[in-house]
């Protein structure tokens, strides 16, 4: 669809994340939530003054391990609420925005690195008094999860089936559509088709349209095709979140300079790790999953419960197939 037609059809879209996040600057674990009605984000102050917006779902399950979901590049926590809410039926789930995106704010002068993002995750877990966590890292978030596992201060648990970093025990990890270093990709930061005379709104919409189109594969997009209605829905709500292009560029730079994969050899070989990666992924080449298997030999593939080709999906994996019937069973089975 033409970007100008999107702008016209979405002209009434107004931001609802900005101005809705909490004003507390120290982390306060929220009361138990009804997962179907996620609350507005709270804020957690980092040591350098950055503020990380977060939500906690499924607080009634806080006695068990907490699932921490780590976003990919340019993504905000609302982008995977369709998956987080069902997962919170059986466990506590923590969602957050990386600094500079959505409800989170950086200091403005920090060097954005994968290691810094990993540090933010650990500090948030400490502030929420979490002790045992599972990690679900999607795309760039998978690289952040690897940086946590291979943190210089990480120590194996006595049974060598987990790691402990600064008092946080990581017991299970899902690496979704991710990579071990700067990946092979069809995505380009300047890939959006933006007319020279485009307005600021049109530029933002064109960038969002391009980014979303990369989440799927061409065969499922277009009038009457299965993923078009999902992409349209994401377009309609897409401008509601803060996604500065300069923050996305800084995240891309962080991916490009990350050199931590050789430290994966120190990850305990009995720590359960699952990989999921669709063969139609245009953001992160399918073969990147084989690199994860090479550096983390204990990693095992996780497949949706569907008939036919179980890897016939693109980058935004949980938009493909039904979450409740296809994705929840294997995810819950692995996490439990």
Predicted feature residues:
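Active-site loop/oxyanion-hole signature of alpha/beta-hydrolase fold enzymes
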Residues: 95, 100-136, 140, 151, ...
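Conserved alpha/beta-hydrolase catalytic His-Asp/Glu region
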Residues: 184, 205-256, 261-266
